[in-house]
Amino acid sequence: MNDKTTRGRASKVDLLPPNIKSTLTMMLRDKQYSQAEILEEINNIIADSGLDESMQLSKTGLNRFASKMERFGKKIREAREVAEVWTKQLVEAPQSDIGKLLMEAVKTMAFDLTLNADEAVANDPKFLNQLALIANRIEQAQSISEERERKVRKEVAQQAADTAEKVISQAGLSADTVAQIKQQILGIA
């Protein structure tokens, strides 16, 4: 077994120039190429680009990257399926409930991301900053949603109070009684 320490070191795929890496990911997603064909093509591109021979990908390295991409793609597909199921079930749900569900889903994904991140990534200041930003935006969205819901409830209560005032006034009750009933309706919301 090789005694080289590689933990925490970027893979050869991670070190590839962006144009070569995007070609690699495109070929992997395409599914019409075998890994052997992809390996040969990418290594030819690396050689033609004038990169050092040590940048050539190995079968194992390519397979590891392909497996990682497949796991990531699977998670995306699963998330889409779950979103589709929930969207169909929530067509009748009030908008605020859907918003709350989406915020909870984002919180869950952020938590899942944190749990699945390796130690190097989890301690990376950029990663932590992004998580803090996500948390902040979720809180802002919840606050805006709750404020919107409060405004809607207040408007509905005001409309109900105004309607009740008209009906009660027409029924011949005193102005004091009308005012008391209106205050009780507005106090509910």
Swiss-Prot record:
Organism, scientific name: Haemophilus influenzae (strain ATCC 51907 / DSM 11121 / KW20 / Rd)
Family as reported in the entry's similarity comment: To phage Mu protein gp27.
InterPro entries, A to Z: Phage_Mu_Gp27
One Pfam family this sequence matches: Phage_Mu_Gp27
Origin: domain of life: Bacteria
Protein's name according to its UniProt entry: Mu-like prophage FluMu protein gp27
